[in-house]
Regions:
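Short, Lys/Arg-enriched N-terminal segments with co-localized hydrophobic residues
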Residues: 1-19
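N-terminal secretory/targeting leader peptides
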Residues: 12, 16-17, 44-144, 152-380
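Bacterial N-terminal signal peptides that target proteins for export
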Residues: 18-29
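Hydrophobic alpha-helical targeting segments used for export or membrane insertion
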Residues: 29-37
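Sec/Tat signal peptide C-region and signal peptidase I cleavage site
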Residues: 38-43
Length: 380
């Protein structure tokens, strides 16, 4: 500089500098993007589910929906962490009465429901298959499995629910076998003649061969008052329900006729709600519905003896029906199974094949019917 030279400026390689800066920015943005993607991939989607039934929470099938079905769904979904259910349970008439579940699910008042099918014989005729074949099997597990297999092998059952804007998941058999509970001692068919019997759906037809006996339609929650007030002399239900609803207080005599186990519940889902569900949730619902079916049927059988013991402890008396009287009762009825099958046949549905398949399934499971409804139907 003393020589008059101008100071030299330091020159930077600008392209290289910019390249390094851009690379750093890209690295930073990439890290942020990865972090955001990672966070979103672990975000759990919450799905609201409104469950309805008109029966109270203490009813076996409702109680086990809370204690078994819901925790099982939660457990399966937690394995992936993709989805979580926000359960909203509404029972005991909060949204619908016992007879209103089918309509409630159809209209979207609930997303998932436990439909009592015996109240809807005109809309769900194929669901009466077990009720139309009394005195065949008194094992809830065998009947539940057979009915569900029929629903899978024949499209009729699922199609009936589809017409009601809902998807069929699984059947439910919540009783070991129907028995007759009475205000006064009953030992034989003659003791039922000329009396009134509370029942629901198809089982009222069991009385048609008994002279002067009349069925009075009612729901399980109505039976106590119906007997107490003298509206009826007897009620057809099962020991576990008799224990739950304290039937021994008004009907202290049980005739053990072993009329048979009947499918009376079906778990369904509103069709629109179902279509919006992710496949993972659909799969969980389908699998747990079958597990719930077997779980509830198993409890019904496990509790059968304990429920009879509880009935006796509450002041009840149990009388075993003479086998000859039981056979006479079965033979006195019209062939309601054949009538059921013909009605479906006439509507273009496979009523007779369904009846034959159902009876064959129960025979293969080790049950010999008191009356072979399918064989009589074939003979005619």
């Amino acid at each position: 500089m003393c020589n008059g030279e101008k100071p030299k400026r330091l020159r930077y390689n600008q392209p290289e500098e910019m390249t390094m800066k851009n690379h750093a920015i890209r690295m930073l943005l990439g890290a942020i993007l990865v972090a955001m993607t990672s966070a979103s991939s672990f975000a759990t989607e919450t799905i609201k589910a409104v469950v309805i039934d008109g029966y109270p929470a203490r009813a076996l099938w409702v109680k086990e929906f809370t204690n078994f079905f819901i925790p099982e769904i939660d457990k399966r979904l937690a394995m992936s962490g993709n989805y979580k259910m926000d359960w909203q349970e509404s029972y005991g008439g909060t949204i619908v009465k016992p007879k209103g579940v089918l309509e409630g699910i159809k209209l979207g008042l609930g997303d998932i429901g436990i439909v009592t099918t015996i109240f809807h014989s005109s809309k769900l005729p194929s669901q009466a298959i077990a009720a139309a074949t009394p005195f065949v099997a008194d094992d809830a597990r065998a009947v539940a499995k057979a009915v569900d297999e029929i629903a899978k092998e024949f499209p009729t059952m699922q199609a009936e629910f589809e017409k009601q804007n809902q998807v069929y998941l699984a059947t439910g058999v919540v009783l070991d076998t129907y028995q007759l509970f009475s205000r006064n001692p009953v030992n034989a068919l003659v003791d039922i003649e000329g009396s009134k019997v509370a029942g629901a759906g198809m089982n009222l037809r069991y009385l048609e061969g008994i002279k002067g006996a009349a069925g009075v339609r009612g729901g399980l929650t109505d039976f106590y008052n119906m007997v107490q007030t003298g509206l009826v002399d007897h009620a057809m239900l099962w020991p576990e329900a008799a224990k739950t609803f304290k039937i021994a207080e008004v009907a202290p005599y049980m005739l053990r006729a072993n009329i048979g186990a009947v499918n009376s519940k079906t778990i369904t889902v509103n069709k629109g709600y179902w279509e919006r569900l992710p496949d993972e949730v659909k799969k969980a619902l389908q699998e747990v519905a079958l597990a719930y079916r077997d779980h509830v049927a198993g409890i019904a059988m496990d509790r059968a003896k304990a429920s009879r013991d509880a009935y006796i402890a509450a002041g009840g008396t149990i009388v075993d029906m003479d086998p000859a009287e039981r056979t006479a009762w079965a033979n006195a009825m019209p062939n309601i199974a054949a009538e059921w099958a013909k009605k479906l046949d006439d509507a273009g549905q496979p009523g007779t094949p369904m009846l034959n398949a159902y009876m064959a399934k129960l025979r293969n499971a080790g049950f010999e019917p008191v009356r072979d409804w399918a064989a009589e139907n074939a003979a005619n």
